[in-house]
Amino acid sequence: PLVSGQARTGISDTMRPGDISSLAQSSERAFRVTFGGSMPEYRDRYWRGLILDTLDDGTWRQSGYDPYQAPGRVNVDGGVGELKPGEYDVLMEPTDQRWAFALEGSVAVSNNVIKKTDNLFRFRRPADSAVRYRLALEGGDEPAAEALLPGDARRYLQLPSEGNPRARALADELRRSSDEIPAGDSSVGDIEVIRTLLTRFREQPYFYTLRPPKMPDDGIDSLLFDEKRGFCAHYAGATTFVLRSAGIPARVVVGYQGGEGGAGNEYLIVRQY
């Protein structure tokens, strides 16, 4: 176990970055991927795993998580043959969780993984041993964004009633500035809010560090206005908070980026760091 205030890189179904003052990089393998065709470009290798959409007392969690699991042990092999172009096999290390990782625009091929309505993939049972599953990338143009259901929109705007007042004021300022732009489509104002916030992170002296100061109280305010140092969880949580405060539905998507080639680029290894 790690001492208080420390953590290791990897995936969890909760996120509370304000309590972490040291993030140790783990080189343990998360999963290995073999492609039936060419390997995607690095920018296209984002492996989505789960969504955190509820903030309570500084902790991001999943809401509406499906607790159902089939009896018995996880099916460790989907029982499919040779890889076809566009398909890819994932050999995932044990996690004792039901989530599976996939690229954007994937569909299930093997019978041991299912696609949920939120475009995430799940096993029917927790992965208590290494699991191999197969997915395929859908061809054609990038799918158009779907309109949010009313329940999803409410959930992706949820915030505690109090806390982080400076971040809320920043969101109000960004919204007022965007409302000054003449446009017939309110989404243009939303895009301007997002663009301005991301420009703030790029142009002001914000830094990425694995050794941030602890920010337990109003941690998003501390990150945005005082410390300006953190790792990916800090910035993801702060961005989601500000966007929700500005009236823009947002959520934290958890996963891995990239991967390194192995055996002459015959497969891809994604590690915990």
Q: Which positions does each model-derived feature cover?
A:
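Helix-boundary/low-complexity linker signature
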Residues: 1-273
